[in-house]
Amino acid sequence: MKILAILALVATIAGAGAVLYGINTLAPQVVQTAANVTEAQSVADTFDDMVTRLENGTFGGRIFGGTDDLRAEDCAFVTYTVRMQNKGFFPAEWISMELVEPKDGDVLALPDDSRHALAAGSVGDMQLTVLRRTDEEEQADTARTLRVTCYVFGRKIVFDVSVA
């Protein structure tokens, strides 16, 4: 009887530990961030397609500033990459990213219509691409704060990430 009581106590402690671990690891953790600048002239097809969609009213992304008189030689695409790790027991689903506060020169964010998920115990990358007008002073300024939103086990989780 004493051995059975000890086994029940050990099982209870192990179960409580597993529950506490699961609660504490619901939110994915940010492992790494990066910003990559690509001149719009070097990806002219993407730029031209985006301008056409803006003119037709079919652009599905988020517009921050004036889209008038966009020229490839005056713009650059900044791709923000956030690497996340999901240490929890449940997958992180419907992951999305957006700029918290666009800066001067940010024109729009390209649409991302895919459904992103991060399986339990895995690592994955999320990307957000922003078109910005470039000039000599602001060209090197890629620091932004991104808001990541996801759902884990039906619970909405929102956190901010700084990318330099």
Regions found by a protein language model. Give the residues of each.
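Membrane engagement elements in two modes
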Residues: M1-E55
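Hydrophobic core residues within well-ordered beta-strands of beta-rich domains
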Residues: V78-Y80, G124, R144
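Asparagine-centered strand-capping/turn motif at beta-strand->loop junctions
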Residues: A76-P91
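Short extracytoplasmic
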Residues: E39-F77
